[in-house]
C-alpha cells in the first residue's frame, strides 16, 4: 500500500459494524469528513452495495478504517479488486473491542490522529 503523495481528495471506507470498534470507525470517518472537507471526498460503509461503492470510488484514493482484525471493509474492497492506499485497524491503534459499547471521545480522536499520521507519512 502506498502513502498519499498528492493533494487528491480521499475516500474513506469503514467497516461500520455493530461492535464498539465498528461504531468507532464510522464516527471517526464522519468527523474527518466534517473537519476536512477539502481532503476527504466522502465516506462509504462496507455494508453498502458493491455497485454503489464501485461507482463512488471509481479509481479514487481509498483510506480504509477497519475496526478489528476481521477486516470487513478491506475484504469488501478486495471483492471489487480495489487496493486501499492506506489501511488502519482500530484495534491495532490501542482500541479494545468490547461488545456494543459506544465509542468514547478520546478513542475517536486517537483514531483520527492515526489516519492523519498515515496520510502524512
Annotate each PLM feature:
Residues 1-121:
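Iron-sulfur-associated redox domains of electron-transfer enzymes in respiratory
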Amino acid at each position: 500500500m502506498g502513502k498519499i503523495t498528492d493533494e487528491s481528495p480521499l475516500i474513506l471506507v469503514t467497516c461500520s459494524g455493530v461492535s464498539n470498534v465498528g461504531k468507532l470507525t464510522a464516527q471517526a470517518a464522519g468527523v474527518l469528513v466534517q473537519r476536512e472537507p477539502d481532503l476527504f471526498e466522502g465516506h462509504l460503509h462496507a455494508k453498502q452495495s458493491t455497485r454503489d461503492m464501485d461507482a463512488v470510488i471509481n479509481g479514487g484514493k481509498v483510506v480504509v478504517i477497519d475496526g478489528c482484525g476481521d477486516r470487513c471493509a478491506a475484504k469488501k474492497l478486495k471483492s471489487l479488486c480495489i487496493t486501499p492506499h492506506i489501511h488502519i485497524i482500530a484495534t491495532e491503534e490501542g482500541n479494545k473491542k468490547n461488545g456494543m459499547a459506544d465509542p468514547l471521545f478520546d478513542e475517536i480522536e486517537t483514531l483520527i490522529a492515526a489516519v492523519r499520521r498515515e496520510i502524512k507519512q
